[in-house]
Amino acid sequence: TQDGKYWLHAGSTNRMATKEELSRLFQQAGLVHFDTSPVASTNISDIDLKAVDHYYRSYYEIDFINLPEDEQRNLLINTDILIEHESNWRVSVGGLLMFGKQPQRYLPQSSIMFAVFKGDDITDDLIDKKEISGTATELIDKAVSLSQLYIPKPSTIEGNQRKEVIHIPPKVLREAVVNAVMHRDYSIGIRKIQLHIYSNRIEITSPGTLANKLTMEKIRYGNSAPRNIFLVKYLDNLRYFDGLGRGIPMMLKALGERIRFEHVGELFRLTLYFSQQD
């Protein structure tokens, strides 16, 4: 409206949009990126400077840790790890997720809830449950390693040799976890990624629907419109994915009909079904 207010149409009524709703609407349209937003109460002491040094040495061949403090600060500012907010320098959401000492202290929604069930339903007996915490790369590495422990590994006999059946190729599992961490909506503060392993499948449920007018059909053909541009850049530089839009097509090629994408309310769910054994 002319007075700067935004209204949402719900059924036969209109109501003023909340700050959180506006944030998600602007994110979905690609107008703002939450991962470059400042996190209140943070400062440079919340950044693991050794991790930053490792990144800059590996990717840019910059000896970050031995730079003068003012040069370190300028580099953090120029790369959106530090963001100015109300005359103070705060760590960005992406900066915390990539280089924070304790990301979940300020972003509790950024952990992954991991659970393993005995059967194929969430009401079945619980075998294991863990909350996975850490930086984005730690979340990915821990979630993949933990999942591999619980994915069934049946074997068949061919001739005189035992052959292990690979239900979910490692590259597919890793791609699925990377996508969840990289593309979830971190502005939804009460939701965490859910990674559930059942007797017949893996379900990864991420907060937020597809962003920037992406559709289920478009992602099948490698179309991408990232919600979190900071995370995409840094995870790409660290070789957690190749940035060519090949991930989903690769998963479809590997699993065929054993993969499913769906929206569940404001959530995005990826299901990877295990192969059926005779």
Q: Which residues does each PLM region occupy?
A:
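Conserved N-terminal catalytic/coupling substructures associated with nucleotide/phosphate chemistry
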Residues: 1-278
